């Protein structure tokens, strides 16, 4: 008797055709700015047997855990939806793994990648001095309860950005630059021969880059 086919259902986030933008941003931050130097990017031709997987991006985290963003294509071929894309976001620890939402994935990433306000900035803000660091992943703080220090530094940075300090005005443009950088690099190899984008762009976050309504 023929064995009945078994299906495994996993939660995925259906996305528009933005995987090339995602791949481009990851490669830029890995090979150009070195912000994601420890990240492992696996393209579709190295995935192996999983023909529906178009890419795997593995982010090593603290205490031996890691976050994996797996992109899927050729979903539901029986209906002809070959252009349908989706991603699965999974967090792995030593003895446990679970699927996570994009907002929580951003929090996990910010615990290891992209600098935030340093402890010395609080003392500089109290003394009225110029702040020397800035949070490069502000979207990761969106869905968590921020500390009083972070809120105070955000207020100080926003107020000073409206004044005469051009540095803070430039930092506020970094998030938009990160998205624009991904769009430019995803146009193809011809764009790679042009002048590279400005370094120091903020990381826009998983949901923003992939177009996920999180």
Curated annotation (Swiss-Prot):
Ranges in coiled-coil conformation:
none
- State the post-translational modifications: Processed in virion by the viral protease. Highly phosphorylated on serine and threonine residues.
Q: Name one Pfam family in it.
A: Vif
Which Gene Ontology BP annotations are present?
viral life cycle
Q: Does the keyword Nuclease apply?
A: no
> HCCH motif: where is this motif?
110-141
The region called Disordered is annotated at 179-204
Other remarks on this protein: Vif-defective viruses show catastrophic failure in reverse transcription due to APOBEC-induced mutations that initiate a DNA base repair pathway and compromise the structural integrity of the ssDNA. In the absence of Vif, the virion is morphologically abnormal.
Q: What is this protein called?
A: Virion infectivity factor
Q: Which organism is it from?
A: Simian immunodeficiency virus (isolate Mm251) (SIV-mac)
